[in-house]
Amino acid sequence: ELAVKKSGMRLEDVDYINTHGTATPPGDIAETNAIKRVFGELAYGININSTKSMTGHLLGAAGSVEFVAVVLSVMNDIIPPTINYEKPDPECDLNYTPNTAVRREVRFALSNSFGFGGHNATLAVRKFTEM
């Protein structure tokens, strides 16, 4: 919520969220609940994915690689899929962009990175437009 506020975006502007998404039930459920708490009903219209489904967990490099993926999504209006998404957890009921990339306008996006011990960050990306 703070990343959206500080970026000058509004919650309803967010088109895409790259989650930390490690495919661990406690982590994925907690992140899903956090997204729903911040965005309310808007959460159901946002494309969400886990880049880690394609790259694996890159540990210290994960946040940087995922941020590059988010920037490319904003530049190219395409959201990468969450691959190998076969058995949805009923508690994770958002649009996780399962198995197939989605082409849609991406004006604003967020990239979540969380670490052990409370090292947490969300980066906000806005599409560049000429003034």
At which residue positions do the language-model features occur?
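Conserved "HGTGT" condensation-loop signature of ketosynthase/thiolase-family condensing enzymes
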Residues: 1-131
